[in-house]
């Protein structure tokens, strides 16, 4: 059995130091801030990113450059026989589709396996952990890809949006909808199950939005994930406000009776 390495991008929330500890590779996502290209966790720190965000900087994101991706593949294939690449969901970025096309080139075919399992942030990170475990158990790159894709709908993400500004800026809602939502002081709750980011519910307060998310997860536990509750992982991702995240963490622990909930900050989501 050949040596298999796991590669993901920084939208998984895995930083370079953690990647080194895990024995994997992480491709940094590019951010364009006031016309300058910066790379997450390379020359863009978390503190600097949120300073730019607070100051109203022009921020956008992009998929990793093709050259950067193939250079990383070439580098890894000098040491490993196969690469399992777990990029950002194909429903939210074209990076997965581009990588899949590149992996069919003669020099990468049968060596690079691109996983299209519709994950982002904490669910993408869990896919990385699953891939590591599968590789350690002796699975091939293709076997890991197939297993992860077979389980692509076994996840749910619920997101509370405190401001509609970035959804409007990114073109995910119309200016009119953003203006109306702001006027009514709405706190949308969004959902990711599979490919797309969809509206799930509307709340008037942060407290109500948090209650909606907790109930939604409980409903998923009782229905969609009823047969695999013992294997489920519960995670919290947040943007910027660590004190609010810690408060919500305690609420979720109390509701579910779980004390090993993972909590991570995510920059990619903040810019959208």
Protein language model annotation of sequence segments:
Residues 3, 11-25, 30, 82, ...:
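Mixed-charge interfacial surface used for oligomerization/domain docking
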Residues 5-63, 68:
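N-terminal glycine-rich anion-binding loop in soluble enzyme alpha/beta folds
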Residues 7-8, 87-89, 115-116:
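Short beta-strand segments
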Residues 34, 43, 116-117, 269:
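Detector for Asparagine
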Residues 44-50, 73, 78, 100-105:
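A short glycine/small-residue-enriched secondary-structure motif
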Residues 51-57, 73-74, 132-134, 161:
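A general structural signal for short secondary-structure boundary/capping elements
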Residues 56-90, 97-98, 145:
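Glycine-rich phosphate- or other oxyanion-binding loops that anchor nucleotides, phosphorylated ligands
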């Amino acid at each position: 059995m050949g040596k298999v390495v796991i590669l993901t991008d920084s939208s998984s929330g895995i930083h370079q130091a953690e990647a080194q500890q895990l024995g994997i590779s992480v491709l940094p996502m590019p951010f364009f801030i006031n016309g300058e290209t910066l790379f997450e966790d390379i020359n863009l720190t978390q503190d600097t990113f949120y300073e730019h965000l607070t100051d109203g900087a022009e921020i956008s994101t992009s998929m990793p450059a093709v050259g950067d991706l193939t250079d990383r593949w070439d580098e890894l294939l000098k040491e490993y026989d196969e690469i399992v690449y777990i990029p950002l969901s194909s429903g939210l970025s074209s990076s997965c589709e581009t990588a899949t096309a590149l992996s069919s080139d003669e020099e990468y075919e049968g060596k690079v396996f691109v996983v299209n399992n519709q994950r982002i942030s904490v669910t993408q990170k869990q896919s990385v952990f699953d891939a590591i475990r599968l590789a350690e158990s002796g699975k091939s790159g293709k076997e890991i890809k197939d297993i992860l894709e077979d389980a692509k709908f076994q996840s749910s993400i619920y997101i509370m949006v405190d401001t509609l500004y970035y959804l409007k800026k990114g073109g995910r809602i119309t200016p009119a909808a953003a203006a109306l939502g702001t006027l009514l002081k709405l706190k949308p709750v969004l959902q990711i199950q599979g490919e797309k980011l969809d509206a799930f519910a509307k709340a008037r307060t942060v407290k109500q939005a948090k209650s909606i998310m907790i109930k939604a997860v409980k409903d998923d536990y009782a229905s969609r994930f009823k047969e695999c509750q013992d294997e489920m992982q519960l995670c919290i991702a947040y943007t910027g406000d660590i004190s609010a995240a810690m408060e919500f963490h305690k609420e979720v622990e109390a509701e579910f009776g779980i004390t090993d909930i993972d909590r991570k900050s995510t920059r990619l989501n903040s810019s959208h």
